[in-house]
């Protein structure tokens, strides 16, 4: 599971009001090379919840992103930053581990890179 995917997931258990961001418990993280596309990264930047991305990247062992979200000027001119963002969003893969609901503590397993977000009957 890539961090770009993680950034779009939330806990949908009935009654949960703050199910985002899911905390990552990383078991096995791998890197898979992906072609760099700066236009795609710039486009996706507006859709990303920055704090959740930074926390997710750090929990997967990647600490190259700044705490504060960069401004638009950085996105236009700073290619090294775009490459770091590209690496975090698209090249880091959580192969084994869990996603944890911040409100309930419910763990959703991640196996072979696929998060299992299915709910039990009593959670719907």
From Swiss-Prot:
It comes from the Eukaryota. Residues 2-120 form the TRM112 domain. One of its GO terms (molecular function) is protein heterodimerization activity. GO terms for biological process: organ growth; regulation of cell cycle; regulation of cell population proliferation. Disruption phenotype: Semi-dwarf phenotype. Reduced organ growth due to inhibition of cell proliferation. Acts as an activator of both rRNA/tRNA and protein methyltransferases. Required for TRM9 tRNA methyltransferase activity. Involved in the regulation of cell division progression during organ growth. Required for the expression of cell cycle-related genes, and the G2-M phase progression during organogenesis. PANTHER family: MULTIFUNCTIONAL METHYLTRANSFERASE SUBUNIT TRM112-LIKE PROTEIN, UPF0315 PROTEIN-RELATED. Interacts with TRM9. Belongs to the TRM112 family. This is Multifunctional methyltransferase subunit TRM112 homolog A. The lineage of its organism: Eukaryota, Viridiplantae, Streptophyta, Embryophyta, Tracheophyta.
């Amino acid at each position: 599971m890539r961090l770009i995917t993680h950034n779009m997931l939330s806990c949908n258990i009935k009654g949960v009001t703050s199910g985002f961001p899911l905390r990552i418990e990383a078991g096995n993280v791998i890197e898979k090379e992906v072609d760099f596309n700066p236009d795609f990264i710039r486009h996706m930047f507006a859709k990303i919840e920055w704090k959740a991305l930074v926390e997710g990247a750090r929990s997967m062992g990647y600490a190259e992103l700044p705490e504060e979200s960069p401004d638009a000027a950085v996105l236009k001119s700073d290619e090294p930053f775009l490459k770091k963002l590209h690496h975090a969003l698209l090249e880091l893969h959580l192969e084994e581990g869990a996603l944890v609901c911040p409100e309930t503590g419910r763990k959703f397993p991640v196996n072979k890179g696929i998060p299992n977000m299915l709910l039990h009957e009593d959670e719907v």
